[in-house]
């Protein structure tokens, strides 16, 4: 068993190569094998760049109001308790609404050491 205590980790800013606006990444974890994830907090208007995941991505919205979009689809609003699944290779972005911050737990699997 491995317990990661709240406050025992170092927060980091989302790099500008992958995010627009202020984004904070907390509590990254690595599970068995290739599973990883973390809590990502987006300031109002902040979002990811368009990207894909080789084995897909699951988002669990925990706070605020967010927006998600897959390539060719409409922008969808998400709220706490909503779960979003992006298929492997599906081009998409996700982030906060224009006026409200959003926080989600992102869970990914890596393929050959790459999750994005």
Predicted regions, residues:
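Beta-rich strand-turn-strand
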Residues: 74-77, 95, 99
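Short, conserved beta-strand element in jelly-roll/cupin
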Residues: 39-43, 52-68, 107-110
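Short acidic-glycine-tyrosine-enriched beta hairpin
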Residues: 72-88
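Ligand-binding pocket scaffold of soluble enzyme catalytic domains
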Residues: 32, 46, 68, 99-108
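Conserved short histidine dyad/triad with adjacent acidic residue
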Residues: 22, 36-53, 88
């Amino acid at each position: 068993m491995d317990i990661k205590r709240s406050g025992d980790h170092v927060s980091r800013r989302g790099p500008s190569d992958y995010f627009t606006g202020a984004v904070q990444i907390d509590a990254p974890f690595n599970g068995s094998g290739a599973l990883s994830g973390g809590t990502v907090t987006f300031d109002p208007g902040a979002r990811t760049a368009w990207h894909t995941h080789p084995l897909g991505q699951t988002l669990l919205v925990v706070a605020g109001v967010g927006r998600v979009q897959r390539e060719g689809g409409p922008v969808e609003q998400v709220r706490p308790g909503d779960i979003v699944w992006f298929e492997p290779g599906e081009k998409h972005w996700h982030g906060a609404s224009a006026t409200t911050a959003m926080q989600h737990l992102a869970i990914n699997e890596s393929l050959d050491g790459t999750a994005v």
